[in-house]
């Protein structure tokens, strides 16, 4: 018997097994929302545009969607050069009603009918209105309805030189979560956003597997760096994510919703300063809140206006633009 050949075969076998396990350990593939199209191959892998917005849910469960999300998706459809994809930071519906699945279906159907106006694939990171019940408690029924009518609750996809990762922040927080105080001064013990250990493990494996990508874009609902602490992730998730993202220099932007406003925690606290361009991978990622997609705006804050963000990728640089959106319907579709 040729033991040298057996040894070489064994090494090859275990190497293949290891690579297969590593591939499986990455985040699951994230699908575009139904009816918004499939992801195509880029004509230029280092030069393209993507759009981000979120938080469009109506003020009340009986209200229709406002004109704002339709205006955003129509603006995307008119872009020249065209956008490759749209990222959404959740709260697509009023939701929070697991007792009435037909009502949830109808709300998703209404939103998806609007999202198709973009003409490009739309990817969503679900929020508390898709995933929780009326007591702000994560609901298995709501999560199952989301998977049935929308997509997976977390996952990733690659486009050109960029990896896009959606996280599901609607999970029970760790026991370390403390009481927080609302802006109105009322103490409450309410579960903030949290990331499960399963997601964190897959996220780390995915970042490790995609170190060669020029950029990684993280999008989710609850902010890592919120305008108000009560709106963010629980401290355990927040610290874990910040430490993890700091270890991977290609993590360019971490963008969340939930707060109905625009907020750049590292930038000036004014109305219209767009996010900074990303060119130096030695710098930490930029943390943003973009929740101006049509839901009732946060009151008495400088960034409370309807908007979306346009990111222009050009090799190792990304340049964002901040676009205000009118409340009156200007979509001709």
Regions found by a protein language model. Name each.
Residues 28-37, 49, 97-211, 215, ...:
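Extended active-site neighborhood of metal-dependent phosphoesterases/phosphodiesterases
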